[in-house]
Amino acid sequence: GVVPSKASFSMHSILVNHFLRGAWYPKGGAGEIAFHTIPVIRKAGGNVLGNAPVQRILLDSQGKACGVSVKKGQGLVNIFAPVIISDAGIFNTYERLLPAEARALPEIQSQLRMATHGEGGFTVFVGLNGSREELGLEPTNYFIYAGDDLDEIMNRYLASSREEAAKNIPLLFVTCPSAKDPTWETRHPGKSTLAIVTFAKYEWFEEWKDKQVSKRGDDYEELKKTFVDTIMQAVFKLYPRIEDRIEYISGGTPLTNQHYIASPRGEIYGIDHNIARLQAEAIATVRAQTAVPNLYLTGQDLCLGGFVGALQGALICGSAVLKRNLYADVARLKKRTQATDSKK
């Protein structure tokens, strides 16, 4: 999520090494992750609530986290627990959900000073009439760049006006989720999907932040459409057969991310995972344990951006809560699994 001059070489090397051997995709789509995780949580005595946004973290008289207050209809419901784990991100957890007296703790202020917001994201989701074979789609992630000097083209883009930026997008990530899913054709015959991601500054859309979603006005919709049109012209060069086969297309700005996933400034990878974030002091300071007893952090902000980064954050957090090295447990599980597989 950062330009090369701000990226950690070691972290990027690990990422490249991973993708050299290919990538994984869940059969049935990303929703299968939640579908199979929720029963495990419930079997252990927990529960998963939908449409219940957390409004604040509750503290007891000693300043210890003891629960959360969630929205239910027009009212609030308090849910109490001995351990509170936040995947809402550092800024949301500390600045939105904690009361002022906890937010002012020196340890929390130190963490906030070390963190900066990641860049906002712009997404395009496309529904297509036609199968993977008909449209020439591939189960491949494409990164499309407008030039070789990634620092220069991205810095120029992010420094430009929103009108200029919308017509000169230097970086696109293009993927075809339906082509990756071996169950897709059975479930949705003759249909396909594309997802495209790029970066966009929150400031370009900030003037509409207080407007209701889907009712932000013609100027907002026109700016969003210009971004989408520019993006799709590049995608048509990659997949020319799709141009007259689009049944659905939707663009999402940083404000879309802010509304649906509560990212403070429309970021998709949490805080900025630049070199400063990966310095020893920052890594030692931003930990799963917080200055508020019984409150823990997990997810991308604790480790790295992306699904695997968030998963690492969960392992780190789980280890802290249980006071047990879950990485050792995973290593032992891998050995047992390999031993079982070798006997088949």
Language-model segments: residues:
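Hydrophobic, well-ordered secondary-structure elements that form the walls
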Residues: 85, 126, 196, 235, ...
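C-terminal segments that line or cap access tunnels to active or ligand-binding sites in enzymes
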Residues: 129-252
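A conserved FAD-binding loop/helix module that cradles the flavin
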Residues: 300-322
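Beta-rich nucleic-acid/ligand-interaction surfaces
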Residues: 47, 52-66, 70, 251-264
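A glycine-rich dinucleotide-binding beta-alpha-beta segment and adjacent secondary-structure elements
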Residues: 1-4, 169-175, 237-304
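Mid-domain catalytic core of redox enzymes
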Residues: 25, 55-187
